[in-house]
Amino acid sequence: MKKPEYVAAVTAMYRKYVDLYLKKGKSGYAVKPEDRENLMDLYNRGDSDTGYYKQHNGREMLALDRPNHAGVAAARCLSQNGREVTAQALTDLHAHDVLEIGSGKDNYTLGKKITKGEKLRFLVPKGMRFKEGFVFRRIRNEELIESLDQKYRKE
């Protein structure tokens, strides 16, 4: 079962693009990058999956390497000095977003908003090493979850 915010966002996005296609036709139809990223923030098994666009069923559609949420590319490692990692934001990040560092208990929760292109610094557990260029993934977009909760919450 999917979480309510996932169902609400996917259904709303589907409706939006069905309406757009019916209104403008194939030539006027294009998915906005921010809409795609929002969907991937909610649940993403990997950036390369095309879903049912190009095929129906088959082993290629299974996420064998990573069956859980893969998140979105969020920050690229610039350097590491001891436990402190310096990274550059690849997308806008929000307070309380969660970056995957290692296993679940080692994830990093941001304390403030970071704009795309800005540098951020955070501590990683002792013994963890990250090479320059390593991409940390956001596995929880708190601002998106909160906005969906506000929009669809039953009073």
Write out the residue ranges for each language-model feature:
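Surface-exposed amphipathic alpha-helical tracts and adjacent flexible/coil segments at the periphery
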Residues: 1-155
